[in-house]
Amino acid sequence: MVVVMKFFRWVRRAWQRIISWVFFWRQKIKPTISGHPDSKKHSLKKMEKTLQVVETLRLVELPKEAKPKLGESPELADPCVLAKTTEETEVELGQQGQSLLQLPRTAVKSVSTLMVSALQSGWQMCSWKSSVSSASVSSQVRTQSPLKTPEAELLWEVYLVLWAVRKHLRRLYRRQERHRRHHVRCHAAPRPNPAQSLKLDAQSPL
C-alpha cells in the first residue's frame, strides 16, 4: 500500500513538471507565432486543444482514512449517543476495509486513464510544437517528425513506466482476488455435525 501511495506521488510530480514544461514552451514560442500571422490561428487552435486535455486530466485520489465522528466526551454523552457513534464507526471501518480491498482495482483504472491521457496530450503537444517550429523556418527546410523529438522520447519512457506499474498492479489485484475467493470458499464449506461424528465413532469397530 505504501508503494502505491509513493507511486501516485511520483506520478503527480511528473505530471506537474510536464504541465510547467508545456507552459514554458508556450511562453517561449509566443514571439515566433506573432511573427507569422498566417499560421497564428492554426497554432492557437492546437494549443487550446492541448491545454483542454491537460485541464480535463484528473488523477484518482486514494480513499481517505475513515475518521470516527465523536461529538461529546464519554463522561457527558448519553448511552444512546455513544451506541450510535460506535455503530457509525463500525460502518466506516467496514467501508474502509472494502475500499482497501478495491484499491488495486482502482489504481489499475487510474493508471490506465493516465496512460491514455498522457499519450493524447503528449502527441498533441509534440504535433503543436512541430507545427509552430515549421512556421518559423523557410518552406524549403523539411519539418522534423514529431516522433523523433526529445519530448516524444520522454513521453515514451513515461508510458513504459506506467505500463510496468499497471502490470504489477493487475498482478496484485489478481492475487488479492484469489485470496478472497479462497477465504470465502473456506468459510462457506459445511462444517461436520458433532452428533454425527459421535455416532460414526460409536459404530466404528475400533
UniProtKB/Swiss-Prot annotation:
Pfam families: DUF4703. It is found in: Cytoplasmic vesicle, Secretory vesicle, Acrosome. Expressed in sperm (at protein level). Keywords: Cytoplasmic vesicle, Differentiation, Spermatogenesis. The keyword Zinc does not apply. One of its GO terms (biological process) is spermatid development. GO terms for cellular component: acrosomal vesicle; nucleus. Its main location: cytoplasm. Residues 180-206 are annotated as: Disordered. May play a role in acrosome formation and nucleus shaping during spermiogenesis. It is linked to A variant causing a frameshift predicted to result in a premature termination codon has been found in a patient with globozoospermia. PANTHER family: CHROMOSOME 7 OPEN READING FRAME 61, SPERM ACROSOME DEVELOPMENTAL REGULATOR. This is Sperm acrosome developmental regulator. The gene is SPACDR.
